[in-house]
Curated annotation (Swiss-Prot):
GO cellular component, one term: mitochondrion
Function: Mitochondrial GTPase that catalyzes the GTP-dependent ribosomal translocation step during translation elongation. During this step, the ribosome changes from the pre-translocational (PRE) to the post-translocational (POST) state as the newly formed A-site-bound peptidyl-tRNA and P-site-bound deacylated tRNA move to the P and E sites, respectively. Catalyzes the coordinated movement of the two tRNA molecules, the mRNA and conformational changes in the ribosome.
NCBIfam families xref list: EF-G (TIGR00484), PRK12740.1-5 (NF009381), small_GTP (TIGR00231)
Entries under Pfam families matching the protein: EFG_C (PF00679), EFG_III (PF14492), EFG_IV (PF03764), GTP_EFTU (PF00009), GTP_EFTU_D2 (PF03144)
Source lineage: Eukaryota, Metazoa, Ecdysozoa, Arthropoda, Hexapoda
Pathway in which this enzyme or protein is active: Protein biosynthesis; polypeptide chain elongation
Membrane spanning residue stretches: none
Descriptive protein name: Elongation factor G, mitochondrial
Family of the protein in this entry: Belongs to the TRAFAC class translation factor GTPase superfamily. Classic translation factor GTPase family. EF-G/EF-2 subfamily.
Organism for this UniProt entry: Culex quinquefasciatus
Domain of life the protein comes from: Eukaryota
UniProt xrefs under PANTHER family: ELONGATION FACTOR G, MITOCHONDRIAL (PTHR43636:SF2)
Domain (tr-type G) ranges: 38-315
Segment annotated as transit peptide: 1-25
């Protein structure tokens, strides 16, 4: 039976799946419970904003029979994409939260996480990649590799996630998949090659060529349900032969079997190529590149086939846990992915969400089996929970299941936990899985309820959102008597402000954005501080000697403490108190009141008293030591620098460059393509506020930009002077003149 025959009967299959219930497994949930390990894929769909991720997911759900009809992003048909379940998402046409779903394709169960592309929601991508086995990296054939693509690529590398690349939007004016492949090699450092080629681009996009099987694929009828195989068009055969040879050549560099065939000048069979692509993709030494246009319903079914052929099942990925016993070094253990239930259950909570029926906790099962009615233990808190319901998720809809196995993604109700917690059924298992990397917030805003009577709802909203999203922080600043929220960008905080009004009927007022500046030393500074207090009875005595020194630039967002003492001048039981005193003082600097960072506290020596020394005495000694360094050291203020990418028609290039220069930007690169240009620049975040409106007005609404955090860097002398003056005015303090000169 040909592919076209198979796919012509898919609507009938979908009908029986949804309506007749005549299959052995009456629903996707039932099928998922019985799937074998080799027939499971856990994948994420990640990319830069507006690359077409949500549209692609909508097509996948339709072709696999999961939904009966397709809807568009931005809710143009008043419905909106299935995976954008939040009303705000459908209005703005962006994905804010990672929606989870599962579907079935060719008897394989596929769990899909659709992730946000906007940099302000990057923690959602982190959470998704942590629990996935493979990913589809979606790239726009016009925009190519953009700023958030670089971020997603780094995240995939951090969690060692194998990926396929899908170059989308072949139908767009200016589509150039060949340029995008070049960017993947130069900017992402991927060993990538086409395994498909487009048959025409823009309005002439007719289908794709499968270079592995050497066949042309056409997607007939309006919905693209029928995939028709045909011979490669005559005018494309030379190009296809060249690209296939390029594919074989790149595979030969990373796969021994293909390398031998290449040296012997033998032509590999399609089976040889598929085996080599799978092996090298799993090892992350090769990235297969597919093409298509999700909006025009071309290339989606072959992408699904590639997910089955080239991405790993849960048994092909090594998942580690740590055995953490008190007083012992943590031991690494490999978790058993077999779906036989012989080993005890181990799961990781990777996302929290307030649902209609209480808190919803998303988990991935890494080992064993979990059944409805079982009791689970939170390893961190030791709390025991009995499970009344197990559910699988389809966007914001739920299907109850009786049990879940290793490799499954599911959700629970009524479990009090934090994101990154490990759950087990055996309380003796002291296992902990690696937690999820959470970036520090870069922007703060003052926030308050518009009406004082809404304070209760405001408190509930803040408590829920800070629990759901670890990058959303909430604090009260006693110096300015303001409540502050911090996050990954203006959009991040604006979205939460709008959600407070929509979901809690609590309108809020946001203040002007405030940048998270940092303070650090320019050069090492020694300290020798004695804290001594005698007031009758037991006194206080503690002396600390050491060096406070700046860390290298790539570590300027952290602070470190090292105990380099020899002997018993500083008893070991007092060292944690010294570290505590240092970290408390690091919360507020002298120049601008911002946190200290990029510093290393080296404790070299000290002294104690047999009676008067205590933890409090040494903590106060450490604080006194930092105060002495405030007075004697040379300090500077650091500011977050953003990697900015601006795209606009080329007639506005001079204007855009001028605007970036005015905002203290450093141009790092430019690109041009068919009447459009892209500029890459590094700009201080403090200078980026209000840029969106300025860019729109100066480019007649045609320009767009994106930015992501790059690093902390010393701020300009005039900015440092201004920050110091503002802080002094608010505190009524004066700083010695020597502090106001930044030493290089």
């Amino acid at each position: 039976m040909t592919i076209s025959c198979l796919l012509r009967i898919r609507p009938a299959l979908a009908k029986s799946f949804f309506e007749n219930g005549q299959r052995a497994f009456a629903s996707h949930a039932a099928f998922a419970e019985h799937a074998k390990l080799e027939r499971i894929r856990n994948i994420g769909i990640s990319a830069h904003i507006d690359s077409g991720k949500t549209t692609l997911t909508e097509r996948i759900l339709f072709y696999t029979g999961r939904i009966k009809e397709m809807h568009e992003v931005k809710g143009k048909d008043n419905v909106g994409a299935t995976m954008d379940s939040m009303e705000l998402e459908r209005q703005r046409g962006i994905t804010i939260q990672s929606a989870a779903t599962y579907t079935v394709w060719k008897d394989h169960n596929i769990n899909i996480i659709d992730t946000p592309g906007h940099v302000d929601f990057t923690v959602e991508v982190e959470r998704a990649l942590r629990v996935l086995d493979g990913a589809v990296l979606v790239l726009c054939s016009v925009g190519g590799v953009q700023s958030q693509t670089l971020t997603v690529n780094r995240q995939m590398k951090r969690y060692n996630v194998p990926c396929l690349a899908f170059i989308n939007k072949l139908d767009r004016m200016g589509a150039n998949p060949y340029r995008v492949l070049g960017q993947m090699k130069s900017k992402l450092n991927h060993n990538a090659a086409f395994i498909q080629l487009p048959i025409g681009v823009e309005s002439n996009c007719k289908g794709i060529v499968d270079l592995v099987k050497q066949k042309a694929l056409y997607f007939d009828d309006q919905l693209g349900l029928t995939v028709r195989e045909d011979e490669i068009p005559q005018d494309m055969r030379t190009e296809c032969d060249e690209r296939r040879h390029e594919l074989i050549e790149q595979l030969s560099n990373v796969d021994d079997a293909i390398g031998e065939l290449f040296l012997e000048e033998k032509t590999p069979t399609p089976q040889d190529l598929m085996g080599a692509i799978r092996r090298s993709t799993l090892k992350r030494t090769f990235t297969p590149v597919l093409v298509g246009t999700a909006l025009k319903n071309k290339g989606v079914q072959p992408l699904l086939d590639a997910v089955l052929d080239y991405l790993p099942n849960p048994g092909e990925v090594e998942n580690l846990a740590m055995i953490e016993k008190k007083g012992e070094e943590p031991q690494k253990v490999f978790l058993n992915p077999a779906r036989d239930g012989k080993d005890p259950f181990v799961g990781l909570a990777f996302k929290l969400e307030a649902g209609r029926f209480g808190q919803l906790t998303y988990l991935r099962c890494y080992q064993g089996v979990l059944k409805k009615g079982d009791s689970i233990f939170n390893v961190r808190s030791g709390k025991k929970v009995r499970l009344a319901r197990l559910v699988r998720l389809h966007s914001n809809n739920m299907e109850d299941v009786n049990e879940v196995y290793a490799g499954d993604i599911f959700a629970l109700f009524g479990v009090d936990c934090a994101s990154g917690d490990t759950f087990v059924t055996d309380p003796k298992l002291e296992l902990s899985m690696e937690s999820i990397f959470v970036p520090d917030p870069v922007v703060s805003m003052a926030i308050k309820p518009t009406n004082t009577k809404d304070r209760d709802n405001f408190s509930k909203a803040v408590a829920r959102f800070t629990k759901e999203d670890p990058t959303f922080r909430f604090a009260y600043d006693p110096d300015v008597k303001e409540t502050l929220v911090s996050g990954m960008g203006e959009l991040h905080l604006e979205i939460y402000a709008q959600r407070m009004e929509r979901e809690y009927n609590c309108p809020v007022t946001l203040g002007k954005p405030k940048v998270a500046f940092r303070e650090t030393l320019v050069a090492p500074c020694e300290f020798d501080y004695l804290h001594k207090k005698q007031s009758g009875g037991q006194g206080q005595y503690g002396r600390v000697t050491g060096i406070l020194e700046p860390l290298p630039p790539h570590q300027n967002t952290v602070i470190e403490f090292t105990d380099e003492t020899i002997g018993t001048n500083v008893p070991k039981q007092f060292v944690p108190a010294i570290e505590k005193g240092f970290r408390q003082m690091a919360e507020k600097g002298l120049l601008s009141g911002h946190k200290l960072s990029g510093l290393k506290f080296r404790l070299l020596d000290g002294a104690h008293h047999i009676v008067d020394s205590s933890e409090l005495a040494f903590m106060l000694a450490a604080q006194g030591a930092i105060k002495s360094v405030f007075e004697n050291g040379s300090w500077q203020i650091l500011e977050p620098v953003m990697m900015v990418e601006v795209t606009a028609p080329e007639e506005f290039q001079g204007t855009v460059i001028g605007q970036l220069n005015k905002r203290h930007g450093i141009i790092t690169g430019t690109e041009g393509t068919e009447g459009w240009f892209t500029i890459y620049a590094e700009v201080p975040l403090n200078d980026m506020f209000g840029y969106a409106g300025e860019l729109r007005s100066s480019t007649q609404g045609k320009g767009e930009f994106s930015m992501e955090y790059s690093r902390y860097s010393p701020c300009m002398p005039d900015v440092q002077e201004q920050l110091m003056r503002e802080y002094q005015a608010s505190q009524g303090i004066a700083v010695p003149d020597k502090k106001q000169k930044k030493k290089n």
